[in-house]
Amino acid sequence: VRHRVRLAAIDAPEKGQAFGKRSRQHLSDLVFRKEVAVQWRKRDRYGRIVGKVMVQSPDCPSCPKNLDAGQAQLSVGLAWWYRKHAREQSPDDRGRYESEEREARARLVGLWRDAAPLPPWDFRRAQLR
């Protein structure tokens, strides 16, 4: 069964933004046409499930679904930890997401290569003007 899912607690660059296509491709490589497990509690205003998507690691196709796709996006610098929604995460997930983003920034990977990457929420707001 196919469902539309928004990854909880991260925000990725929009299509028209730097790293938007790369972020989308990385996520697609992780989850497209794969069996995933989704831990969720709500839907967004567009009817999408908002949740944590767990998938098998590409390095171990016979392993259980133990790779958090949102955390994977953060670790390669292709998303922001969406602190606005941090309270909806478990304390453990908050800690992992914060750490992944901090480490990606320190390594200057993905969008953190740019001197001042524009968060997608600011990009969307600018598009409305």
Name each model-derived stretch:
Residues 1-129:
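Small beta-barrel nucleic-acid-binding modules, primarily SNase/OB-fold domains
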